Amino acid sequence: MQYSLRIWEERVREERMIIRIMTIDDYDQVWHLWSEIKGFGIRTLDDSREGVEKFLKRNPSTSVVAEEDGMVIGAILCGHDGRRGCMYHVCVAEKYRKHGIGHQMALAAMEALKAEGINKVSLIAFKSNTIGNKFWRKVGWTFREDLNYFDFTLNEENITRFIE
């Protein structure tokens, strides 16, 4: 599992940027990054330190960060249920976009999923996220017009706050 991420670290090291497995020690920097992304939705419980720690314990090798000079400049929460992978909160700091960092992080997360025997991965992007939607199509993801997405709130305290 970590072997494939080491390959990514070696590929990008010359650029002073590495992609590595996310740990709970990255939380403060990742939270700061999330809070700077316009249109981003942050949930009070799921995205709290405790919520992210629970997610990372369940999925210890599939979430990644891009780091340059000790600073987190990109992140993907990625996990699976044993059948399908899912990416959440894919983001790159605005001044680092359009350099392939998002694509490299997505590839690293997908390699980690493949190493765990996962054959398919999905993600949700807000319709208003034109930059993200364009990116996913550009890197070969399929937009599903044949599905409806439903969710049901089990805990009303898990409020989503949108960054404007």
What do these predicted regions represent?
Residues M1-D25, E156-E164:
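Conserved N-terminal entry element of GNAT/NAT acetyltransferase domains
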Residues V90-R97, A125-F126:
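A short, internal acetyl-CoA/4′-phosphopantetheine-binding micro-motif in the GNAT/acyltransferase core
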Residues L113-A125:
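Conserved GNAT acetyl-CoA-binding A-motif
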Residues L123-G132, D151:
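Conserved beta-strand-loop-alpha-helix junction that forms the acyl-donor binding cleft
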Residues I21-H89, A106, A112, E116, ...:
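Acetyl-CoA-dependent GNAT
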Residues K98-E111, K138:
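Conserved acetyl-CoA-binding loop-helix of GNAT-fold acetyltransferases
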Residues R137-D146:
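Conserved acetyl-CoA-binding loop of GNAT-fold acetyltransferases
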